[in-house]
Amino acid sequence: MTVIRKKHPLIKMINHSFIDLPAPSNISSWWNFGSLLGLCLIIQILTGLFLAMHYTSDTATAFSSVAHICRDVNYGWLIRYMHANGASMFFICLFLHVGRGIYYGSYNMIETWNMGIILLFAVMATAFMGYVLPWGQMSFWGATVITNLLSAIPYIGTTLVEWIWGGFSVDKATLTRFFAFHFILPFIITALVLVHLLFLHETGSNNPTGLNSDTDKIPFHPYYTIKDFLGVLILLMVFMILALFFPDILGDPDNYTPANPLNTPPHIKPEWYFLFAYAILRSIPNKLGGVLALILSILILALMPILHTSKQRALTFRPITQTMYWILVADLFILTWIGGQPVEYPFIIIGQTASIAYFTIIMILMPITSVIENNILNLD
């Protein structure tokens, strides 16, 4: 077995990536989320494949085909709810994974980090298009509002929107192409994940101290395969509780009403995992400004390596910047809450304050506190 593992061209690659991979001896449970994201991706592809067998991407039958899956297909209700809540679990793991990267300074592995940002955009695009497919009220109006934002682009905006729609409004052509893209993107994401891992294995993993761990490595298997398996069990338990007992808790009741272009819902909002970005978008009264802020709210992650002014890599031994980090986390929770509220006083002003705080903490306060800590420790 050892001979095959180390000499077979294909198995050798798997061996170097998941079995004999040298890993730091001190990485904590925060390093579990990479493997959990891989599991989420597999679950989403498999459940999505079975849903696609019964789904029809036509405005006349899309809503009823989803109802048919839940009522008439064997375990169709389970597959549908696993897919819907699997997206939520995917984003929970994604946010924790990115949060870990920021806390421990993993963004200094620039290629891996930038590949991760591309992956984040790809997953967000996939999730958005998937939300449109059931063709409920929130699907239709969410698609209309979000795609319409592209009309803010000077000169080509309106043409671009109509090109994406395939007509003068969100209709059959839009639904068909969204289904096509939603089907193909997870496979593109899988390819990008392999590139992400390729870059990661070029440098090796970071660790909680932020120090070089070349002198203290252990094999990935059995140590971290067992550790990851515990994470998998916890994730599956939470996931199945969510999908079996509270399947609709993260969804929108409006999406159980078939799409009606003549009846606008009182409050249009995306899924919970986009609410922080949606709140930032809405906090700027200008359309183009809002769109730029929306894109920048994710793209700002690419500036992290440039904004790193500390002589230490991780936040482990930096209490002042740690405080800033946890204020940023609290701010993201506030933005998520605001994104789900109607556009009225006092939510408007809270959203604007939280949006300013978000960019200020990342671009100004964290670099400043890092310099202060350098001076306190005489590391300048």
From Swiss-Prot:
The keyword Chloroplast does not apply. GO terms for molecular function: metal ion binding; ubiquinol-cytochrome-c reductase activity. Its cofactor is heme b. Binds 2 heme b groups non-covalently. Keywords: Electron transport, Heme, Iron, Membrane, Metal-binding, Mitochondrion, Mitochondrion inner membrane, Respiratory chain, Transmembrane, Transmembrane helix, Transport, Ubiquinone. One of its GO terms (cellular component) is respiratory chain complex III. PROSITE patterns: CYTB_CTER, CYTB_NTER. Pfam families: Cytochrom_B_C (PF00032), Cytochrome_B (PF00033). InterPro entries: Cyt_b/b6_C (IPR005798), Cyt_b/b6_C_sf (IPR036150), Cyt_b/b6_N (IPR005797), Cytb/b6-like_sf (IPR027387), Cytochrome_b (IPR030689), Cytochrome_b_C_euk/bac (IPR048260), Cytochrome_b_N_euk/bac (IPR048259), Di-haem_cyt_TM (IPR016174). SUPFAM superfamilies: a domain/subunit of cytochrome bc1 complex (Ubiquinol-cytochrome c reductase) (SSF81648), Transmembrane di-heme cytochromes (SSF81342). It is a multi-pass membrane protein. Its main location: mitochondrion. A ubiquinone binds at H201. Heme b b562 binds at H83, H182. Belongs to the cytochrome b family. The cytochrome bc1 complex contains 11 subunits: 3 respiratory subunits (MT-CYB, CYC1 and UQCRFS1), 2 core proteins (UQCRC1 and UQCRC2) and 6 low-molecular weight proteins (UQCRH/QCR6, UQCRB/QCR7, UQCRQ/QCR8, UQCR10/QCR9, UQCR11/QCR10 and a cleavage product of UQCRFS1). This cytochrome bc1 complex then forms a dimer. This is Cytochrome b. The gene is MT-CYB.
